[in-house]
Amino acid sequence: MSLGDLGFHTVSLSGPATLYELAEIRESLLAAIAVGKDLRIDLETTGPWDLAGLQLMISATASGRRAGQAVRLVNVPRVCAEIAERSGLSNWLSSVTDTFL
């Protein structure tokens, strides 16, 4: 994890974002939210994805919002965007994403 620009704390995730990895990813995201700064989640080196991974991103943004923090996604992989599209969540994903791959 590193401090990003514009006052955001940036956490870079890598590897699979599926049901089997959620506990570890969730703990990383909760720790990042606990820093107390707006959060940028870099997803460039993540994959494969499943719906559980997308649900975790929804949960992270909601947790940040409850804590008064902005949570933004960057470098969202195409496969994640495709899952959002199939799930009817494209508009939500676009609303929290700064960049797609």
Give the positions of each predicted feature.
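STAS-like cytosolic regulatory interaction modules
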Residues: 1-52, 58-101
